[in-house]
Amino acid sequence: RTVKALDGVDLTVLSGETHGILGESGSGKSTLGRVILGFLAPSSGEIRTCGREPNRLKTSDRLDFRKEAQVIHQDSLSALNPRMTLGDSAAEGLRMRNVTRPEALKRVTELFEMVGLPQMLMDRFPNEVSGGQRQRVCIARALTLKPKLLIADEPVTALDVSVQSQILDLFKNLKAELDLAMIFISHDIDVIAEVCDNVSVIRKGAVVEQGVTDEVLTRPKSDYTRNLMASMPGKQWL
């Protein structure tokens, strides 16, 4: 039996907009992110990311594309090289593009300040800082290349609630300051409500509901969305 990981997904995200992808585990959220970034090729349809079709890019063009579209993963510890200092890890994308180490570290210093990290952490290793600090490093690293699109795949799931709030505030500030297009992937309705202008609710790879976040969450039309929201204990969405 053929199973479609994604089926008929239609999604447009503009500069300065944060679009949420909401659904349960296994709904196809992360698969959609991988297709948008060109890590997976769709069997049909068209994907355009920053004006390009990522699955059809020549090898020589992929490095330029990676500059325009960046991803932040859930597990910041796995995302960072344990043998590299945080400063060098954040500067890695610049170094791959022949930026000198002093110039790259200067850019990283500016971004550490932007994401709320002290400069002294640039000489630390990933296992020497907290999970929230590591995630801020990953955000700084994603911003070094001045991307047009940022995809955040469950970026606060592994963090304590108090740290989650700080990271979500950071994402909101960065969107306003940098005019980024952002796709925020999460199973958590509270997270989507906090940071997203619009939302697509996904079930079994298909979009069951899409619209302005406040409207979707306060007046859901889909039974799946209503059930998803009702499953959150202590929440009075409906």
Where are these regions (language model features)?
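Helix-to-loop junction immediately C-terminal to a conserved catalytic motif
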Residues: L37
